[in-house]
């Protein structure tokens, strides 16, 4: 199997979650072995999507360096990882990725418009060789070896609308689009009011998030899935794990995970070469994992 990029340049415009202003997003093809590269056109700064460039994980995944940063990259990265795209250049004219509808489906549609192009180099993957776990109290994220990669996620909120939810997602492109990509981000009204008082989340609305008060969902259309909340957590994890630089072939298991724990997991996996193996997807290995990329 070969590495991929997009076939043609595409662009869109969307609102930024925090500033509430229009942002121009452009996706461009990139050569083999270049990975995922972000570029801020407004300040002329580039950042490679990798764990070392993560600078904040409090409310979103933020990458950057001394020249600047780009916030809320996880939904776009999730779509890119879900589509198995290895190399792509992402250009934005602001310090955040547009929120679109709060899910990854708009980015999937943009990738469909761009098309997928195979390159000459073999596709690299990260095979999980040992269990790796990062925990904080009862919360944890872990990855374990598996020939049938899946995301097994449980969330637990002391809230009547959410409660405890678990979803197991067997990874493949087709299932990603059907089961995960449309799940929207969610937030509590009391938190939104606090953030907007700090001039943050100014672009948040019922058009780009599931909003919850003390007892109800505020969106008139309701949920897209009965368990949309936990599905969105999987969406985030698919995006955060893309920072490893290649598809992770192993199970991801989480209880009450977060962007911060996901980031710490990527660092922990890469910290010891006994934890993983970088391999080219071919021969018997390709046969084992073919359906992941279907």
From Swiss-Prot:
One of its GO terms (molecular function) is UDP-3-O-acyl-N-acetylglucosamine deacetylase activity. One of its GO terms (biological process) is lipid A biosynthetic process. It is an enzyme of class 3 (hydrolase). Its cofactor is Zn(2+). Keywords: Hydrolase, Lipid A biosynthesis, Lipid biosynthesis, Lipid metabolism, Metal-binding, Zinc. Its EC number is 3.5.1.108. Zn(2+) binds at residues 75, 232, 236. The active site is at residue 259. GO terms for cellular component: membrane. Pathway: Glycolipid biosynthesis; lipid IV(A) biosynthesis; lipid IV(A) from (3R)-3-hydroxytetradecanoyl-[acyl-carrier-protein] and UDP-N-acetyl-alpha-D-glucosamine: step 2/6. It catalyses: a UDP-3-O-[(3R)-3-hydroxyacyl]-N-acetyl-alpha-D-glucosamine + H2O = a UDP-3-O-[(3R)-3-hydroxyacyl]-alpha-D-glucosamine + acetate. Catalyzes the hydrolysis of UDP-3-O-myristoyl-N-acetylglucosamine to form UDP-3-O-myristoylglucosamine and acetate, the committed step in lipid A biosynthesis. Belongs to the LpxC family. NCBIfam families: lpxC. This is UDP-3-O-acyl-N-acetylglucosamine deacetylase. The gene is lpxC.
